[in-house]
Design a protein with these regions (language model features):
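Conserved acetyl-CoA-binding loop-helix of GNAT-fold acetyltransferases
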Residues: 72, 78-91
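Short amphipathic alpha-helix that is part of the acyltransferase structural core
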Residues: 1-29, 129
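Conserved GNAT acetyl-CoA-binding A-motif
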Residues: 93-107
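Active-site rim helix/loop that mediates acceptor-substrate recognition in acyltransferases
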Residues: 20-47
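Acidic/histidine-enriched, beta-strand-rich ligand/metal-binding domains
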Residues: 77, 112-113
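Conserved beta-strand in the GNAT
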Residues: 43, 49-58, 64-66, 71
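Conserved catalytic-core motifs of GNAT/GCN5-like acyltransferases
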Residues: 102-106, 115, 119-137
Length: 137
């Protein structure tokens, strides 16, 4: 089966179980509230399982979006899932010209790895419009 990137609009019980493995520190109610607020949640699916996900807050009128909680399950890292998740998320929102991920979103012990990953995705480390440091494309 092929890896696909889906924009989730409703969470079924399987999605909730899988997102619990992606974001074990978060509660399903928070994901539902994120969606109900009109925000986007993209997930990488393989063999009917979610392997990674990212939340997106997009302001289409300004052509601007921020990425939140970008994560791939540890057991499936370094296999291209994250890169495909980012590339296809950007492709699915063509009205967005500026993409950002704040460094504060990433635990300090993972920043070096995330820096290499985000640069591989075409992002640069810089000062963001919010004034904090992070990656922008």
């Amino acid at each position: 089966m092929k890896l696909t990137i889906e924009r989730l609009v409703e969470l079924n019980s399987d999605d909730i179980r899988d997102l619990g493995k992606v974001w074990p520190e978060q509660q399903p109610e928070a994901w539902q509230a994120w969606l109900e607020a009109g925000n986007a949640l993209f997930a990488a699916r393989f063999n009917d399982r979610l392997l990674g996900a990212v939340k997106v807050f997009a302001d289409k009128t300004k052509g601007f979006a921020t990425l939140h909680d970008l994560r791939v399950r540890e057991v499936t890292r370094r296999r291209g899932v994250g890169l495909y998740l980012i590339e296809d998320t950007l492709r699915q929102l063509p009205d967005i010209n500026v993409w950002q991920l704040a460094a504060s979103e990433v635990p300090s012990e993972n920043r070096e790895e995330m820096d290499a990953f985000m640069k591989a995705c075409g992002f640069n480390f810089c000062e963001l419009s919010s004034g904090e440091q992070g990656w922008q494309s």
